């Protein structure tokens, strides 16, 4: 058999196998692709030709289309909507340059998508340097089927009256701007079952206070805000059902929170918060992660973490142990303590700072509850940190396991190896309050050898 004939047979066989797939499976596969590629598959065969019209997702990015196309980007999107036949539109994603797309067209497309019982809407307005923002008005905020809404980049949220989004559960506001504070309030108040809110803000501030209120169903809140200008005060949050709080960056001075049902809080950076009661807002949590400076955070008098069972703290900040001592003294039921040194090429030995002082009384959590102690990337050269580790081992009566990890060391660095072996032996030799405590030492492979200290 000639090579060409063999190839033709293999192609035909391959084509036959594809044809045997049920339409439902083909549509499922196509739903993971951008619409431009999905439409292109219609040339494969007669079976594929109508399938793209039934794919429940539409995704357009203006960068995928150039000026050499037969039709403009807006015309292509319009034609796609006119040809599309899926009874339910699961998602509509549109990435565009605001100055190249008529806002009227966007409103038309969103309106058509809403009429198809749209469940997820993603609008990404690329910033090309012109500063022209796409205005997201109240007229685009009436949809009873929408479950997820993401607004990204150069979009102006201008909402003069409460929206109607009875099914919206997830809302992401990523680097968008706001006409005024009432636009935020009108957006949130019209989402009666909203469960997840993500707010990302940049350096430009257009409002003084970001208020999250009238959202009794909110369960998850994420804030990432690196704006530190004087004109922006901060956040006022009233979320009676909030369970999870994540703050990735927060440089504003003000922060007020009412979240009596909060179960977990991860605070990665709140270095500019000056509210003396910041930690007091978190006393209901069971799991807490803190990466804060003890110099800038005041522990609120009388605040007790009665529910806290798991605490993770980062140890980069100067005198971080002062905050640790306070947390141990005020967390009587703590069961898990994790300390993490997130320094890579940053050495703490030369930092100023005071000595660590033992608590006047052994904290109740050490006497009765602490079971797991983990110290990731333990600093072998800092006496204060060895003292803290020794103190916990000596006083944690119910400790089951103590794990110390360190970043790897080159075999040529004999001095470091000797020092770590010495400290390892010292810690392993500590007379522990718990006879059943297992001592574990291991290397943390997530750090590169070149970054070891």
Swiss-Prot record:
Name under which the protein is recorded: F-box/FBD/LRR-repeat protein At4g00160
Keyword Repeat set for record: yes
Domain called F-box: residue spans: 15-68
Record InterPro entries: F-box-like_dom_sf, F-box_AtFBL13-like, F-box_dom, FBD, FBL13/AtMIF1-like, LRR_dom_sf, LRR_FXL15/At3g58940/PEG3-like
UniProt domain FBD: residue ranges: 355-406
Database matches in CDD domains: F-box_AtFBL13-like (cd22160)
UniProtKB keywords: Leucine-rich repeat, Repeat
Species in which this protein is naturally found: Arabidopsis thaliana (Mouse-ear cress)
Repeat region (LRR), residues: 89-111, 165-190, 215-239, 247-270, 282-307, 331-358
């Amino acid at each position: 058999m000639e090579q060409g004939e063999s190839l033709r047979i293999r192609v035909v066989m391959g084509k036959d196998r594809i044809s045997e797939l049920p339409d439902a499976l083909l549509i499922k596969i196509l739903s993971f692709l951008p619409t431009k590629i999905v439409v292109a598959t219609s040339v494969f065969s007669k079976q594929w030709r109508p399938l793209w019209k039934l794919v429940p997702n539409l995704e357009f990015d203006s960068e995928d289309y150039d000026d050499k196309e037969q039709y403009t980007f807006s015309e292509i999107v319009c034609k796609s909507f006119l040809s599309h036949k899926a009874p339910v539109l699961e998602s509509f994603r549109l990435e565009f340059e605001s100055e190249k797309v008529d806002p009227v067209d966007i409103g038309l497309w969103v309106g058509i998508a809403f009429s198809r019982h749209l469940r997820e809407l993603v609008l990404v307005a690329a910033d090309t340097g012109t500063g022209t923002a796409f205005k997201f008005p109240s007229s685009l905020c009436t949809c009873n089927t929408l479950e997820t809404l993401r607004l990204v980049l150069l979009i102006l949220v201008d909402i003069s009256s409460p929206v109607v989004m009875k099914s919206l559960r997830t809302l992401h506001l990523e680097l968008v701007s706001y006409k005024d504070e009432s636009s935020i309030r009108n957006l949130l108040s019209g989402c009666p079952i909203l469960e997840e809110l993500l707010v990302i803000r940049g350096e430009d501030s257009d409002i003084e206070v970001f208020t999250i209120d009238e959202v009794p169903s909110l369960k998850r809140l994420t804030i990432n805000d690196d704006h530190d200008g004087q004109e922006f005060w901060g956040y006022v949050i009233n979320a009676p059902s909030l369970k999870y709080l994540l703050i990735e960056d927060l440089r504003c001075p003000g922060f007020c929170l009412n979240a009596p049902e909060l179960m977990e809080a991860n605070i990665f950076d709140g270095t500019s918060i000056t509210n003396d009661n910041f930690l007091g807002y978190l006393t209901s949590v069971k799991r807490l992660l803190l990466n804060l400076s003890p110099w800038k955070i005041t522990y609120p008098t009388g605040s007790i973490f009665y529910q806290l069972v798991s605490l993770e703290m980062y140890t980069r900040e100067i005198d971080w142990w002062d905050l640790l001592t306070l947390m141990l003294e005020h967390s009587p039921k703590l069961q898990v303590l994790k300390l993490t040194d997130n320094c890579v090429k940053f050495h703490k030995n030369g930092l100023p700072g005071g000595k660590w002082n033992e608590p006047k009384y052994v904290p109740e959590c050490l006497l009765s509850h602490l079971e797991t102690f983990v110290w990731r990337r333990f600093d072998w050269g800092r006496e204060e940190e060895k003292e803290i580790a020794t103190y916990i081992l000596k006083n944690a009566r119910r400790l089951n396991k103590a794990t110390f990890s360190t970043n790897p060391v080159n075999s040529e660095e004999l001095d470091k190896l000797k020092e770590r072996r010495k400290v390892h032996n010292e810690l392993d030799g500590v007379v522990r309050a718990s006879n059943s405590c297992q001592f574990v030492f291991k290397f943390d492979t997530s750090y590169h050898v070149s970054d070891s200290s």
